[in-house]
Amino acid sequence: MNPKSNPDTIFSAPIDKIGDFTFDERVAEVFPDMIQRSVPGYSNIISAIGMLAERFVKPHSNIYDLGCSLGAATLSMRRHIKQEGCKIIAVDNSPAMVERCKLHVNAYRSDTPVTVVEADIRNIEIENASVVVLNFTLQFLSPEDRYALLEKIYAGLRPGGILILSEKFVFEDEVSNELLIDLHHDFKRANGYSELEISQKRSAIENVMRPDSKKDHKERFAKIGFSSYDVWFQCFNFGSMFAIK
């Protein structure tokens, strides 16, 4: 279940000078609508994150949601966690997102406590973790920061622990890449976004979100030492991967 929000009209009117996309108050207000209409398969990913957490969570361990935004993945995991002594740490560097995330988390009663932290995920200590989630977050970090964060996650995971990584993908074959971009734009059109909105959002986000290929992700997982990893979900050029320690 995702929190309701106002409709996303941020890029509906012409903007003279388009700045870089930021997760500010305006975005936080419309985020559930924005992400449902922009990310193919988002609801499926959120639901399955809960199911994956249920399989991999261990008693008396920590679960991390890094780049938690409004807490959709956190809430999905908390609904599925039945083990004793578990704690979810949800982290985001956007004050507007953190404020709303706390409201959403506090609206549901659960035996699994959630701590919502306003911080840079690169500075968070990962320890005693059985599950770590990076849901459309890693792609906003610089390439060198991505590797360092994944190394830190690996070190903080218990043996048998899982990293769930959802990302937008680029494809090495140019024809495939362009086709999947076009299909994604068709998806956005079908969800009511205009050509102006699609174009302006793309201009705003292209400098701050730099996606990797699935091959890049797998090579990184292998180099860091994860024993098993693969794609478990994909819709167009969006998908989710697992990596098991």
Curated annotation (Swiss-Prot):
User: Could you say which EC number(s) this protein's record lists?
Assistant: 2.1.3.-
Which residues does S-adenosyl-L-methionine bind?
Y42, G67, C68, S69, D92, N93, D120, I121, N135, R202
Could you tell me what reaction this enzyme catalyses? prephenate + S-adenosyl-L-methionine = carboxy-S-adenosyl-L-methionine + 3-phenylpyruvate + H2O
Pfam families, sorted: Methyltransf_25
Check the record and name the SUPFAM superfamilies matching this protein.
S-adenosyl-L-methionine-dependent methyltransferases
Annotated keywords: S-adenosyl-L-methionine, Transferase
- Output the GO biological process annotations, alphabetical, semicolon-separated: tRNA wobble uridine modification
Output the InterPro entries linked to this UniProt entry. Answer: CmoA, Methyltransf_25, SAM-dependent_MTases_sf
The UniProt GO MF terms for this protein read: carboxyl- or carbamoyltransferase activity; S-adenosyl-L-methionine binding
This chain's function reads: Catalyzes the conversion of S-adenosyl-L-methionine (SAM) to carboxy-S-adenosyl-L-methionine (Cx-SAM).
- Spell out the family assignment given in the record's similarity comment: Belongs to the class I-like SAM-binding methyltransferase superfamily. Cx-SAM synthase family.
Query: Subunit composition?
Result: Homodimer.
Q: What NCBIfam families does the database record attribute to this sequence?
A: carboxy-S-adenosyl-L-methionine synthase CmoA, PRK15451.1
**Name of this chain's protein:** Carboxy-S-adenosyl-L-methionine synthase
State the species of origin: Vibrio parahaemolyticus serotype O3:K6 (strain RIMD 2210633)
